[in-house]
């Protein structure tokens, strides 16, 4: 397991190694049923979270999770020097020419929902990554050199800070690359120029508005207060919530009346489909904040598995569909596709 610590915190180590609140590979032996999976997980230390990390207890079809869409960043990037564990790092201002080969690890449930180094929220189902010196945000292509699989991720966090690890990926990204079970992989990391990426697809890069300075100023005190509260809390013993524990397989009953009551007229978009209902609800909440179109979850059974599909509609016109798709892509929430209502 790689060791990772958020640059803004100085935390005590787990497993009795003194300072530096990081996720320790030596702790992986305490998860006897899944030692291989635990071996590559890492994450930013946080007093308010349990000290063990891991994969979700439920199975996730990551093939349905789209890669991050490279978006031009209008405004300043987070590239200030910082010191962690006595070492000072000097982030780059531009990731486009970045090339590196090394070991990748991943981090998961412990940090799901927590703030990243640039103030975003870590989502273990998102296609994101942590890096020591790339600007935040930036985009990179990560290729597993053992199997040739490749993904695009948005870099929005700092780490990993120990051993030979060059990048930490989200659980979803690691699983798409085929190394979530083994923990680490030898990868190639390549910076992406968003403008060039869009040009290669015959489309101009979407315009992204910079965040108002007033909003940034208002968010700073709240973030500092949240961080202070987190640092005052002790490390807890990890006990997964009851809803996360594996449960017996029960017959699935879908509320067909609820699904059938949806309007049949108009156009519909689907942004994702999840085996985990919590993931569907999370995406639904995010989509509701970026589009005026109705967002709903339609559940179906496929191959003896329940799928919770996150959809939008009805949408009145093709032009409105196009604008809605662009808004969702700009927000980096997925690749919405047209579907028929059912």
Curated annotation (Swiss-Prot):
It comes from the Bacteria. Residues 261-342 form the SPOR domain. InterPro entries: RlpA, RlpA-like_DPBB, RlpA-like_sf, RplA, SPOR-like_dom, SPOR-like_sf. GO terms for biological process: cell wall organization; peptidoglycan metabolic process. Coiled coil: none annotated. It is a lipid-anchor. Keywords: Cell membrane, Cell wall biogenesis/degradation, Lipoprotein, Lyase, Membrane, Palmitate, Signal. Pfam families: DPBB_1 (PF03330), SPOR (PF05036). It is found in: Cell membrane. A lipid is attached at residue 27 (N-palmitoyl cysteine). It is an enzyme of class 4 (lyase). A lipid is attached at residue 27 (S-diacylglycerol cysteine). Lytic transglycosylase with a strong preference for naked glycan strands that lack stem peptides. Belongs to the RlpA family. This is Endolytic peptidoglycan transglycosylase RlpA. The lineage of its organism: Bacteria, Pseudomonadati, Pseudomonadota, Gammaproteobacteria, Pseudomonadales.
């Amino acid at each position: 397991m790689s060791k990772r610590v958020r640059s803004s915190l100085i935390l005590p180590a787990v497993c009795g190694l003194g300072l530096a609140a990081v996720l320790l590979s030596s702790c992986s032996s305490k998860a006897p049923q899944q030692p291989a999976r635990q071996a590559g997980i890492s994450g930013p230390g946080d007093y308010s979270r349990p000290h063990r990390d891991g994969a979700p207890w439920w199975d996730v079809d990551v093939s349905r999770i789209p890669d991050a869409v490279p978006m031009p960043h209008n405004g300043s990037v987070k590239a200030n020097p910082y010191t962690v564990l006595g070492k000072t790092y000097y982030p780059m201002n531009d990731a486009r020419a970045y090339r590196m080969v090394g070991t990748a690890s991943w981090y998961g449930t412990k940090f799901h929902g927590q703030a990243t180094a640039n103030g975003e929220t870590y989502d273990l189902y998102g296609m994101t990554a942590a890096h020591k010196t790339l600007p935040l945000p930036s985009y990179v292509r990560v290729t597993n050199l053992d199997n040739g699989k490749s993904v695009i991720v948005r870099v929005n966090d700092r780490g990993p800070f120990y051993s030979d690890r060059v990048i930490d990926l989200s659980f979803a990204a690691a699983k798409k690359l085929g190394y979530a079970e083994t923990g680490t992989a030898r990868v190639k990391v390549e910076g992406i120029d968003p403008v060039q990426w869009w040009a290669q697809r015959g489309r101009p890069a979407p315009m992204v508005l910079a965040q108002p300075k007033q909003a940034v100023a208002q968010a700073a005190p709240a973030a500092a207060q949240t961080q202070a509260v987190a640092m005052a809390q002790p490390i807890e013993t990890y006990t997964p919530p009851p809803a996360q524990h594996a449960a017996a397989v029960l017959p699935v009953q879908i509320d067909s009346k609820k699904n059938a009551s949806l309007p049949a007229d108009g156009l519909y978009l689907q942004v994702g489909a999840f085996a985990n209902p919590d993931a569907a609800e999370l995406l639904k909440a995010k989509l509701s904040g970026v589009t005026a179109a109705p967002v709903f979850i339609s559940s179906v059974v496929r191959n003896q598995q329940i799928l919770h599909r996150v959809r939008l509609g009805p949408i009145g016109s093709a032009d409105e569909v196009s604008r809605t798709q662009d808004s969702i892509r700009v927000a980096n929430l997925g690749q919405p596709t047209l579907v028929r209502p059912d």
